Regions:
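N-terminal exported-region signature
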Residues: 1-187
Length: 187
């Protein structure tokens, strides 16, 4: 999962996950940090993960299906570049509309065999052809694993040439139209 809204009260773990029915042992982790929820008498998150950033992918482990609801302002993608290192990178999706893998990674230099994957889909870069696989479209609120050969900086584009990126899916168009509505994640 990734989070692409700036909450008025701040993007701490406890603010972002406030709508969850929290139980002891609920866990959120990024590539480098994690936080675990401790119930009564503590009733708080403890760990090295303090703030949620839009550049990162997160994994959340809950005891039962739950929904995260958020209300905030969308981030400007150009204000949140993502440093990409050779090897595996946990990448958040900053834009509030979806785009193709090719559009999203146009600022990177992929090599043959580089991989992008979501929880259930993937694409591999094939020189001379481009990204192939069943992951064709990156979406808001999803997190991705990117294995890449060349270091770079990922800045999701807001336009292609002189025109805005066209949303491909109806869901992406709907997401843009309701940016101020609560965002819901089902686990």
């Amino acid at each position: 999962v990734s989070f692409n809204l700036n909450l008025p009260e701040g993007n701490t773990v406890s603010n972002v996950l406030a709508s969850l029915k929290l139980k002891s042992g609920t866990l959120i982790k990024s590539e480098d940090f994690s936080a675990k929820y401790y119930g009564s008498p503590i009733n708080d998150w403890k760990g090295s993960l303090i703030d949620i950033t839009p550049q990162k992918r997160y994994m959340i482990n809950v005891a039962e299906k739950d929904t995260i609801c958020m209300k905030g302002s969308p981030y400007l993608t150009e204000e949140f570049p993502i440093t990409i290192s050779p090897g595996w990178n946990w990448v958040g999706y900053v834009p509030s509309t979806g785009m193709t893998v090719t559009q999203a990674f146009r600022g990177l230099t992929p090599l043959n065999g580089d991989i992008i994957k979501s929880q259930t889909l993937f694409a591999q870069y094939v020189a001379g052809i481009g990204w192939i696989g069943n992951l064709n479209f990156l979406e808001p609120l999803k997190g991705y694993l990117l294995k890449i050969s060349n270091a770079g900086t990922l800045v999701y584009p807001t336009s292609t040439g002189n025109r805005p990126i066209e949303a491909i899916s109806p869901e992406a168009l709907a997401a843009q139209a309701i940016q101020e509505a609560p965002m819901t994640f089902d686990f």
